[in-house]
């Protein structure tokens, strides 16, 4: 099982619109809260509705970020070489069940970042020996990825959240890295 000093599973980093690789999938901590806030604040009203399943104002986003529990939950994502968060997943692990929320900056959509986050969430759930992943999203893109990944509605109810039941099995390593602060990121590394 992952620990605070052992990062989580990652995928090959996708590229941005210029073909430059984004940083590796990384886990954010309390020091990254301002960057998380900026990422979520940049979402327009429609994107906020899709991300949070309800309308949310700037004050609500500030309250949400202030209540993130980085020791209990997992907040992972992808950053540009400048350290800007362009894709974010907040993953809660409770009693053998994982739920999550995803967001991708509008200019970085249609590049596989959402799919990378989605796959990362499922890998993280397996790493934590979860028996089920729950998807509460109303986003058509997330619902499409969920259906393609085998998520189903329990009992066929159209109002129930989508769930993916996981088989108990051992899974590969946990190799996400902490995200560097924007000032520590070298533009030459891109």
Locations of regions flagged by a protein language model:
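Short acidic N-proximal helix/loop "leader" segments that mark the beginning
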Residues: 1-19
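A short beta-loop-alpha structural element at the N-terminal edge
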Residues: 23-36
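Acetyl-CoA-dependent GNAT
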Residues: 42, 49-99
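Conserved acetyl-CoA-binding loop-helix of GNAT-fold acetyltransferases
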Residues: 104, 110-125, 148
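Conserved GNAT acetyl-CoA-binding A-motif
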Residues: 125-138
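Conserved catalytic-core motifs of GNAT/GCN5-like acyltransferases
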Residues: 136, 152-167
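Short, charged/polar, Gly/Pro-enriched secondary-structure boundary elements
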Residues: 168-175
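Short, cationic low-complexity segments
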Residues: 175-190
